[in-house]
From Swiss-Prot:
The keyword Iron does not apply. The lineage of its organism: Viruses, Duplodnaviria, Heunggongvirae, Peploviricota, Herviviricetes. Transmembrane segments: none annotated. The gene is SCP. It comes from Psittacid herpesvirus 1 (isolate Amazon parrot/-/97-0001/1997). This is Small capsomere-interacting protein. Belongs to the herpesviridae small capsomere-interacting protein family.
Length: 141
């Protein structure tokens, strides 16, 4: 059914924008596109696939990953590059400007200016003591 919904929209011309938006309009088409993206090898991804992934949501990605984990047997070669494809899809989702607007990170970024802001958000200097005391200074004492 997802192929018929993609074939019904020839208005996109070369298919770079029209096919992705038509696939996004139907119910499970974004999840199906994500499953196809996650199943293909990372070297064979097309720019159209990458643009379609950037238009999907994080909920679609988690649903696609759940579907793949239940469908794939343990010896399947797709499991070898599933982690790389998931990382690529997450980076595409993070760079999408639509998701940046939904997250509204500006007030949080304003609070994170300076070391006091990082301290209040739980990044402690005790986790990296080499920043406070370089080895050259400790040898001179």
């Amino acid at each position: 059914m997802s192929t018929s919904s993609r074939q019904q929209s020839p208005a996109g011309g070369d298919g770079s924008t029209g096919g992705g938006s038509a696939a996004h309009c139907s119910g499970h088409a974004p999840v199906n596109a994500l499953v196809e993206f996650l199943r293909t090898a990372p070297r064979t991804h097309t720019p159209e696939q990458l643009q379609a992934i950037a238009r999907s949501s994080i909920n679609d990605l988690s649903e696609a990953l759940r579907a793949l984990r239940t469908d794939l047997p343990k010896g399947d070669p797709v499991r070898g590059f599933l982690r790389a494809n998931t990382t690529l899809a997450l980076s595409l989702l993070n760079h999408a400007p639509r998701l940046r607007e939904q997250l509204n990170i500006q007030p949080v970024a304003a609070r994170l200016t300076g070391p006091q802001g990082f301290w209040s958000f739980g990044i402690r200097q005790r986790n990296r003591p080499q920043i406070l005391r370089p080895p050259q200074l400790s040898r001179k004492k």
